[in-house]
Amino acid sequence: RTVVFLKGCNQVCLWCHNPESLLPAPQVLRKDSLCTRCGRCEEVCPHGAVFHNDAGFLTDHTKCVRCGHCIDLCPSDALMLVGYDKTVEEVVKLVCKDRDFYQRTGGGVTFSGGEPAVQSEFLLQCLEACREQGIQTAIETNGNYPLELTARLSPLLDYVMVDVKHTD
């Protein structure tokens, strides 16, 4: 299966296995174990989004415009852009690259995240376009979305995987 990760989540689980997908927008993330604290990211940021204090180098995501200057100049590859703005057509084109594999294996595409239903209109359009291409569809969801959305999603899905977060 091909997995398309959509950013944005309506829960903040302490044990989240995809914390980079919590915020809905693309963001610059730092892998602290690779950071040498050279300060180049802070020097090159034209918006003052990167700064340091006793805790180390931090990013103010409200100031960051994701220009990539800090990523390009990081000598230790500690910075990366997580998430990309894509159109429905771009996503479906990527998914269709694996069409031969799907036909041989019975696979398809799974939309995951974060919580894919956070981007419900985009998700619905992607599912519809994949179905038009004859691609089997699935979502991995926490199930925490409006009931009305279920009626719109159901006809476009072959599988629904519900990730149960907690039971009492």
Short names for language-model regions:
Residues 154-167:
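Non-cysteine beta-strand/loop elements that form the S-adenosyl-L-methionine
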Residues 2-4:
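N-terminal pre-core extensions flanking Radical SAM catalytic domains
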Residues 22-155:
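Conserved Radical SAM active-site core
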Residues 8-11:
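Active-site beta-to-alpha loop of glycosyltransferases that engages the nucleotide-sugar donor
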Residues 13-17, 74:
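The canonical Cys-X-X-Cys-His
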